[in-house]
Regions:
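C-terminal beta-rich recognition modules with glycine/proline-rich loops and embedded aromatic residues
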Residues: 49, 220, 295, 359-368, ...
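Helix-terminus loop motifs that line ligand-binding clefts
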Residues: 82, 96-135, 306-315
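Aromatic (Trp/Tyr) and acidic
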Residues: 21-96, 100, 128-157, 197-215, ...
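Asp-box/WD-like beta-propeller blade repeats and closely related beta-sheet repeat scaffolds
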Residues: 124-135, 142, 160-195
Length: 647
């Protein structure tokens, strides 16, 4: 990570480059309730709370725990996933309608716990056994109980104790049935070489951090050994140390379906990242840096070989070297659970490493793949969100009126809101640019600093940050400069800062005594960059992927672009400016830009050779009518020159 320190007077200061420690102390995030959004992102969040979370019935989602006849499905994840967002959202919004629903769901879950501690819906012979999703469901049930504990511990200690005691009994059951000495240890249960089951490491670490009971850390250590030492297990450590790409960690049988080899496959994207999330939690307590290094290496491999221009990846939820295939029509791409888990992993790695690359990745995913997965009124989340075609609701899962991605979808907003600001020592980090008011505690000072931000980013480049502190405070203020933008202007209290700003992403750190009303104003240029794979091209503007949409009625959204002209326009990495413009259906689209481009292949006809005006919207807005008549595309074919075929 590159940082620039500006000390004392901002105009006369000497700016120096420093390198952050490889893995510095963990940054703190915004506490739930200490941030409020404004503008279009606030509207999207409000729609999710109002039209999705409030319309879920947690009693219905948890009723499956009382019908213990399952042998294969995963419906026991739904209540825990609901709580993964609903409980923190209540802390953020204090919505009076939400809390009673959360309480009712909690009571239903507690009432379903068996005497031996089990909460689930599997028949006894299939519990903690090979195949199925029983142990995976326990993971989400523990997470849900711990979220409930977190929102009750300050105001209702009795309920908080019931939540933590219920979670402890469930974890004790898991230790007995899948821990040391069990018939099937945890990596032998479930599917995908035990990855789904071993991802229980995250809630086990949460439970240890809240209780400090050694038996839970001991169980976490056992799960880590199962993840890393079992030859037939997930092998999340040695395969990373050997440099094996995430897509190449499985030995699969010959197959016509990606689901073949479901018991032994190690390439399941969602579950692999969930395991690394747990390993990072374990590193925070034990200091086992080899585990963190494996997580970082694997995440960087995901960036290099899997993540597409929309910030997500996977086909049929499996890694497949997808970055180089993203222009091709692979089936079932970009599952929303994969998208959200990637966001959570980036959020965690940002707080641990301080490396701005994780914020860059998170931002790209949030503004593209994540927002694209959401119905524009927030009521639904898609299961898959392709890079071209149309958008639609996913199928129902497990004989219930929901699915895994609908249950998981709202969680992405929580990661975004919590990590707008982070702090460590005497430093505040501004990671994301969204109109908002937020405060965060500065550990060294023991006080909170409040900020107000106004911006239309990423549609427009200006970001205005006001310091809403109550008294002068001396601390470092580090502002992220995204790698995908250029800084046109950087001002502090009206005075220009002209040096020390990283060109390829990083943080600018301003160290001084801040006064109430101080202002940092930055104007980013948002260059349009062309991306090419084989004979297909796509365009990004800043962090936003651009798409043609049928609502523009400006021709075939998949029209060929003339290769010779395009190559001249973007020669040697040149970027362009696609100006923002108004559109009659502006409420449907967050951003519309246009450009004169060489569309069509009839270069022998002067009129057809002329460049045409082409409109683009942000990928997240493309196809958001969720109608078969509203189609879109982000990758465009180039015309071919037969000369390249000649020897």
């Amino acid at each position: 990570m590159k940082k620039n320190i500006i000390v004392g007077s901002l105009i006369a200061a000497v700016v120096s480059q420093i390198s952050a420690a490889a893995f510095p102390d963990v940054r703190s995030e915004i506490q739930d309730g200490d941030a409020s959004l404004q503008g279009p992102i606030a509207l999207a969040f409000e729609n999710v709370v109002k039209n999705h979370v409030l319309r879920q019935d947690p009693v219905y989602l948890s009723e499956c725990f009382k019908d213990r006849t399952e042998v294969d499905f995963w419906q026991t994840e739904f209540w825990g996933k609901y709580m993964h967002s609903a409980a923190p959202f209540w802390s953020i919004t204090k919505c009076s309608q939400l809390k009673p629903r959360i309480d009712a769901g909690f009571e239903n879950v507690v009432s379903a716990q068996l005497e031996n501690g089990y909460i689930g819906n599997y028949i006894e012979s299939r519990r903690s056994a090979p195949g199925g999703w029983d142990v995976w469901g326990i993971k989400y049930t523990m997470l849900g109980l711990l979220h409930y504990y977190d929102i009750e511990k300050a105001s209702n200690p009795e309920r908080a104790k019931r939540a933590i005691d219920t979670c402890k009994r469930l974890c004790d059951y898991l230790i007995k049935t899948a821990g040391p000495g069990a018939k099937y240890t945890i990596a032998k249960t479930g599917n995908y070489s035990g990855q789904p089951s071993c991802s229980n490491l995250e809630p086990v670490m949460w439970l240890y951090n809240r209780t400090k009971e050694q038996k839970y850390l001991d169980f976490a250590k056992f799960i880590v050994s199962q993840m890393t030492e079992d030859e037939n297990g997930p092998r999340l450590l040695d395969l990373a140390q050997k440099g094996v790409p995430v897509a190449d960690r499985s030995v699969l049988p010959k197959r016509n379906s990606i689901w073949s080899g479901v018991r032994t496959n190690r390439g399941k994207a969602y579950e692999m990242m969930s395991c690394y999330q747990g390993l990072i939690e374990y590193y925070e307590v034990t200091g086992r840096k080899d585990l963190l290094d494996a997580a970082v290496w694997s995440a960087k491999n995901i960036i290099q070989e899997e993540i597409n221009l929309a910030g997500s990846g996977a086909s049929y939820e499996h890694w497949y070297h997808g970055a180089k295939h993203q222009h091709e029509p692979f089936m079932h791409t970009q599952e929303t659970c994969v998208t959200i888990t990637w966001m959570r992993l980036c959020e965690k790695l940002l707080s641990i490493t301080g490396d701005s690359v994780w914020a860059d990745q998170f931002e790209k995913t949030f503004y593209n793949a994540y927002l694209a997965s959401m119905h524009r009124d927030g009521k639904l989340f898609a299961v898959y969100t392709p890079l071209d075609g149309t958008r639609s609701e996913g199928q129902i899962h497990c004989r219930m009126h929901t699915n895994c991605c609908n249950a998981n979808g709202p969680r992405g907003f929580l990661s975004f809101i919590r990590s707008i600001l982070q702090s460590k020592g005497d430093e505040v980090f501004l990671n994301y640019f969204v109109s908002s008011r937020a405060s965060i505690k500065i550990p060294v000072l023991g006080k909170k600093a409040a900020f107000e931000m106004h911006t239309h980013y990423p549609k427009l480049g200006e970001v205005d940050v006001r310091f809403r502190i109550q008294e002068p405070m001396k601390f470092k203020f580090s502002m992220r400069i995204p790698a995908c933008v250029k800084v046109a202007k950087f001002k502090v209290n009206g005075e220009f800062v002209t040096s020390g700003i990283p060109e390829n992403g990083g943080y600018v750190t301003l160290e001084r005594t801040w006064n109430p009303g101080d202002a940092v104003v930055v104007d980013f240029e948002l260059p349009v960059k062309m991306h090419r794979i084989d004979d297909s091209i796509a365009f990004t503007r800043g962090p936003v992927l651009l798409a043609r949409d049928s609502r523009f009625c400006d021709g075939d959204v998949g029209a060929v672009m003339r290769v010779d002209d395009i190559e001249k326009m973007f020669a040697d990495g040149k970027t362009m400016d696609f100006p923002v413009e108004a559109f009659s259906n502006q409420d449907d689209m967050r951003m519309v830009v246009s450009a004169r481009l060489p569309v069509g292949g009839h270069d022998e006809n002067r009129d057809r050779r002329a460049f045409a005006t082409v409109k683009f919207c942000d990928y997240a807005s493309a196809g958001n009518l969720w109608s078969p008549s509203n189609y879109y595309r982000v990758w465009f074919p180039l015309s071919h020159n037969p000369a390249k075929l000649m020897k």
